[in-house]
Regions:
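C-terminal regions of mature proteins
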Residues: 77, 233-390, 394-398
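A structural signal for the main folded, soluble domain(s) of proteins
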Residues: 56-57, 82-85, 89, 97-106, ...
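A conserved hydrophobic secondary-structure block that centers on an alpha-helix together
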Residues: 45-71
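Glycine-rich, charged/polar anion/phosphate-binding loops
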Residues: 59, 115-124, 142, 180-183, ...
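M16 family metallopeptidases and their MPP-like homologs
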Residues: 1, 23-48, 70-76, 132-142, ...
Length: 515
């Protein structure tokens, strides 16, 4: 008894994904640019279509594509490669026959003219629809196999949309096109694309949105990109590459994923995405030769393979879809005979029993488990050299840093009056984000990014190994730069510490410095 309903882990997860405006926007952009190929489909499954997938179709898809012949095997680390390959062959590959699997991701044929689409996303009944739309200008920019061009577009994204005073973002915000403006460059797929998005926009200003973008890009081509912004973008990207700081993720895992960005489409150059030093060197040569301006003209202005997407909020959209699904299931239930209804109940009960049955212990043993004895007990030796330089303690650590020098300045706070402690949080938030004697804030940011890997201030407290009550507090200034530019790093830190303009109104402080 009761109505029919759909339920499932992936089904419910994808229903949630299809209700997020950012996810809906990204999906609609992909669909608009690649309507005829894989990228125009939803990899996780569209909730409207997931129930149509039969179990037999699911198994057939798995048999076809989830096979070693369609796999990419990647090993990372210092190892006996022959022994590892022999292990993989004996324990895995030798159990399968070689198959031909056609899993090539083909390219979308270019458009004759840009597509113009209007889509919807759901909002709550209490949420306003006014000035709550998304406007997106997106263009396909070639393939991921051209690492020089891909890296250049990452830098263009920085120069046009991310750096302080970025011309594209500034022009749209100054015109009131959206409450926020951002962009992205997607190079993790075969055909890459660049987009500019205005969030919280009036859909009636779509033509103005496009016009401003094209005017700024045209002016940029004619007058040239700010050289300092390009230099900062190249330096920023090179630093990210050299540091390879992937937070809690293993470096080998991320390298493997980066390699797939090229390897999936080009067997001849699998390591192109992780061999970028020559690319950065080449871009430094090209930055004053019109290369970046030519990319803007060719791909962002003269390229018809793109779309202008308007994503509008729609109150009641979720309820309307739910009602349509309810009516569909009610109609299906009404079409069933009593015998068919009984069979449906029986299948549901069998499925629930299968789901609740504990896993076979023998099957569980197939999953490899990390044991305590597998973990190396020896730690990496840590050494430092303590020096006295003009009465200050200097700790020097010699470690491999891929050509980057790191500097930490620690200022002891033991003599700071208690009533001034709350101001430390404010001080660390404004240093590096206000004008100095020789730079405006925007110029300072570009100079820091062009010459260094960043300068950050903070407050740090260190406890004592032998006492929970003992501690020392420091105000820290941390910076990093390529070895040849460590003197510039010191210069920029002195500029920030000694000449930052710390006289501002409460309005400036709250609205601009620490928004």
């Amino acid at each position: 008894e009761g109505p029919l309903t759909y339920n499932g882990v992936v089904y419910n997860e994808m229903k949630g994904a299809f209700s997020s405006p950012d996810d809906v926007l990204e999906r609609d952009i992909m669909n608009s640019l690649f309507p005829d190929i894989t990228y125009g489909c939803e990899s996780g499954g569209d909730p409207d279509n997931i129930p149509e997938l039969s179990y037999e179709e699911f198994l057939e898809f798995h048999r076809t594509y989830y096979h070693p012949s369609n796999s990419y095997i990647y090993l990372y680390g210092n190892m006996d490669m022959a022994a590892k390959l022999d292990f993989i062959d004996r324990n895995y590959l030798s159990a399968f026959d070689s198959l031909y699997v056609d899993s090539e991701i083909r390219e979308q044929q270019p458009f004759d003219k840009m597509h113009d689409l209007v889509m919807e996303y759901p909002v709550a009944e209490s949420e306003s629809e006014e000035n709550n739309s998304y406007l997106a200008y997106s263009v396909v920019t070639g393939t991921a196999m051209d690492t020089l061009k891909c890296t250049a577009f990452d830098i263009l994204d920085y120069a046009l949309l991310s750096t302080p005073g970025a011309p594209l973002k500034k022009a749209l915000l100054d015109a009131g096109i959206g409450s926020d403006v951002y962009g992205s460059y997607e190079d993790g797929i075969r055909q890459t694309y660049f987009d500019v998005v205005a969030k919280g926009a009036d859909p009636g200003r779509k033509e103005e949105f496009v016009s401003i973008i094209r005017k700024v890009l045209t002016d940029t081509v004619e007058n040239g990109i700010d050289p300092k912004a390009l230099e900062a973008g190249i330096n920023y990207m090179e630093f990210r590459y050299r540091e390879a700081d992937f937070s809690s993720y293993p470096k080998g895992l991320i390298y493997g994923l980066d390699i797939l960005d090229n390897w999936l489409y080009d067997d001849e150059h699998p390591f192109a995405q992780v061999q970028l030093i020559p690319v950065f060197d080449k871009l430094k040569e090209l930055k004053n030769q019109g290369y970046f301006e030519d990319l803007i003209q060719r791909y962002l202005l003269d390229n018809p393979h793109g779309s202008v997407l308007t994503l509008n909020p729609s109150r009641g959209l979720t309820a309307r879809k739910a009602k349509a699904l309810e009516d569909k299931l009610d109609a299906y239930l009404s079409s069933l005979s009593e015998e068919e209804k009984t069979e449906l109940v029986k299948k549901t009960a069998n499925l629930e029993q299968y789901q609740e049955t504990p896993e076979d212990p023998e099957a569980a043993k197939c999953i490899p488990m990390l044991k305590r004895e597998d973990i190396r007990k020896e730690i990496t030796p840590f050494t430092n050299e303590a020096l006295d330089i003009d009465g200050s303690l200097f700790l020097y650590h010699e470690v491999p840093t891929n050509g980057i020098g790191y500097l930490d300045l620690m200022f002891d706070l033991k003599d700071l009056a208690d009533e001034k402690i709350p101001y430390l949080g404010l001080l660390k938030s404004v240093l590096g984000y206000v004008d100095t004697a020789h730079y405006t804030y925007g110029e300072l940011t570009n100079e820091i990014n062009a010459q260094t890997g960043g300068i950050m201030c903070g407050v740090e407290v260190f406890d004592h190994a032998d006492s929970v009550d003992a501690f020392r507090a420091f105000f820290s200034v941390r910076g990093k730069a390529m070895y040849p530019k460590t003197d510039v790093l010191f210069k920029m830190i002195r500029e920030i510490i000694n000449t930052s303009s710390l006289k501002f109104t409460t309005e400036d402080l709250i609205g601009k410095v620490i928004p």
